[in-house]
Amino acid sequence: MIPDMDPDQPTPTSPHAGPCSHHDHPRPAVPGVALHWCDEQAEIHRIVVGDFENNVFVLRCRQTGQSVLIDAANEHDKLLELCRALDVQSVLETHGHWDHIQAVPAVREAGYRVAVTADDAAMLPSYDDLLEDETVLEVGRLRLHTICTPGHTPG
């Protein structure tokens, strides 16, 4: 998933993109959360959870404050705290392996919608929405385009 951004602004892969000043972009008050990357339009926050040290990311629109959690891996208490701190609207699962989905029941119970590809949906204990290749999702004023890359899992 790649957010659409202003073509005149640096992208996450450009040499001009990088960590923002923490003075301009305060971190959420959640232990273990780091501001991984940002520019004028978006922030990416990262937390590492579980025994397998899974990376969980939150993409946040800087203009609206709305966010999406990427992979409800495990340690649901930490993830729910992060969701509340960063105004998460929904959860996107990158794939259905057990170490990326353990917190799905807890985040759904807390009211967050969970989306996954149809080919991996059966691997999740539950979900709300199916993602197709080239689905466009809005997170505030950002647009995410899904790209299905089967191989690691079916979807």
Where are these regions (language model features)?
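Accessory terminal helices/loops
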Residues: 1-39
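Intrinsic disorder/low-complexity detector
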Residues: 6-10, 56-57, 73, 99
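A composition/secondary-structure signal for short, hydrophobic, low-basic-content segments
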Residues: 5, 12, 91-96, 148
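Active-site HxH/HxHxD metal-binding segment of metal-dependent hydrolases
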Residues: 53, 67, 74-145
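Glycine-rich His-Gly loop
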Residues: 61, 96, 151
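Conserved beta-strand hairpin/beta-sheet module of binuclear metal-dependent hydrolase folds
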Residues: 32-86
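Short acidic/polar alpha-helix capping motifs at helix-coil junctions
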Residues: 19-22, 41-48, 67-70, 97-101, ...
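Core dinuclear metal-dependent hydrolase active-site scaffold
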Residues: 36, 46-47, 57-58, 134-155
